[in-house]
Amino acid sequence: MDRGLVALATAHGVSTWYEDWRHRRVEVAPETVVGVLGLLGVDATSPAAIADALAAARAVDRTALPPTVVLTEGRTRALPGPGVVSLEDGGRRAVDGELPGDLPLGWHHLTCDGREVILVVVPRRLPAPPRTWGWMLQLYSLTSARSWGMGDLGDLAEFTGWAGTTGAGLVLLNPLHAVGPAHPVAASPYSPASRRFVNPLYLRVGDTGAYAAADPATRAVVDALRPDRGDLIDYDEVWTAKRHALELLHPYAPPVDLDADPALRNFATWCALAERHGNDWRAWPAELHHPDAPAVAEQAGQLADRVAFHAWLQHLCDEQLDAVTAAARSTGMPVGVVHDLAVGIDPGGADGWQLADVLAQGVRVGAPPDDFNQLGQDWGLAAWRPDRLAETGYAAYRDMLRRTLRHAGGLRVDHVAGLWRLWWVPPGAGAAEGTYVRYDADAMLGILALEAHRAGAVVVGEDLGTVQPAVTRGLRGRNMLGSTVLWFARDDDGAFTPPARWPRNALATISTHDLPTAPGFLTGEHVRVRDELKLLGTDVAVERARAAADRERLLAMLRAESLLPRSRDAATEAGGPPDAAGKAAGRPDAATKAGGEPDDGDVVVAMHAALAASPSRLLGVSLYDVLGEVRQPNMPGTVDEYPNWRLPLPASVAQIRTDPGVTRIVDLLTAARPRRATAAPAGTTATAAPGDMLADADPAGQRATPDAGRA
């Protein structure tokens, strides 16, 4: 590659090579580098253009203040001269050649050397998360006597209140991000129209003030619209019913002040326009491509009732999420509800329209080739432009975090490595023909820490896959948790790692939404369905043999750790009683299959006993695992071939509360992780005890695994 192009790419944070999952150096094609530089507004299409752009990059005064300064509390920073800090609270501080280490946390302004820049003072670290356990929940999968064909925020409040009374410390949700209002309704929560607003599909119609205020005849019409639960969740049917019901109730609601929240007004305007023109703003008439365009104002006036309606839906979402937070707080949950932040957005959605100035237009975020995805992955998501974020004081990033965290006791950040770098695929290129673009990780992580600190929230980064060591170190240094998954906790020879060696600085789980459930793994369902969908890269017999070997490796680890009870016959032959696994699992005698194989139910309990035996700060339990569901929520590599994000749980909220298998797991984990008397209620900030910081060395972590696919 031309040296000038390499230097230009380096100056703008664009990688010209990367290390693949086999730790081999891979050179990026020059045309990819040129294409990605173009997405950053840098012309590199000719030698002359490269020379001009490189000269401009080298002419930048490196001693000048950047547009945004992110300073960690307790640290100082040299300045080019005297200045004044205008504090967030209205105060002012004169500074002379250096930013002092005692500035308060927050968003300030610095005037120095003839410039005014944003100054963000961020915490060194968050308080250490409590040692507790909780449920991982795909909210759409819940059902109850009052929900309409899918789980809703009323179900979540009920479930959270019950979980808190049984000793759970958290409930981790799928993303509740907004999707487009036009049909077909998007099922994937990881490709949202907006990460700043909530999907009104999750509203409980009967819990709204407008329903209570409506006359009996209107309520009867609304009640008759309720769809029944089906074998699969039909988002279009649910949205059609709920939208009609809420339209009937809207006249009974007080008006929403759109001037109080310009971002909400713009989002509601996008929703109204999307109903008229479709969910992808890029296909709208050109005069509607910018929120401030005169044609947008004209059509918003024509659609004033629809704009008001969609703004009202967001107010309802806020009210019902507040009720969920109250349910967690009332039971003393030390963490509470943990929301999930998707790695990106649908570029044609509301955020792509409203935040276009800070997004790289035309880029598609994905992942490079790996052992599981040899052609790479194209998630079709938009990406922040790192230069524009800095130029605008990270305002869009901050506001996104604030809107999510105001209802959260914790935040899971999907693909947290994206705060360091993202795989950009330029227009016209295949998923493997992208490259990494670097972000200011200190700024991204620091601002996340500041907003989480203010919300009293814990942070969990999804750092599975081939992530750089800097990611794990960065999370640990700020008391943010990583992720560990039993399936990936392996030694180099493929043996499962004993739970005592799992990382302390982590949320530990058996599986994820992209992987087989515990019952599905034990029965080989993951092989059967992938064979049926033509997703296997090898012969099905080979895959079955691998799955059987993996099962035996798992059983060997559970037996070695005395977590799996032996059968009575096996114990008698060994000259002793059934072993100690019964204690951990709460069942002294093991059921067995023909041939002495342990019962799958006992194995699932033992797998949860492994979670309980780990040093990991947080433990996450999936209802799919505990209720015996063999189908996984999402099958990477499929769209319509598999019912992704549409599988209801096999039990209702009421049935979950009395299910013997659920009770067994609750008893096991509550005994292993009893509530600490000093735990802070959900939504408040606890103070870490001395020596309780997470920056110390963790036990051995898990083997690097490829990035999980995203549908």
Task: Please tell me what each predicted stretch does.
Residues 1-173, 208-216, 453, 458, ...:
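Carbohydrate-interacting/catalytic domains
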Residues 38-74, 86-112, 118-354:
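Acidic/aromatic-lined carbohydrate-recognition and catalytic surfaces
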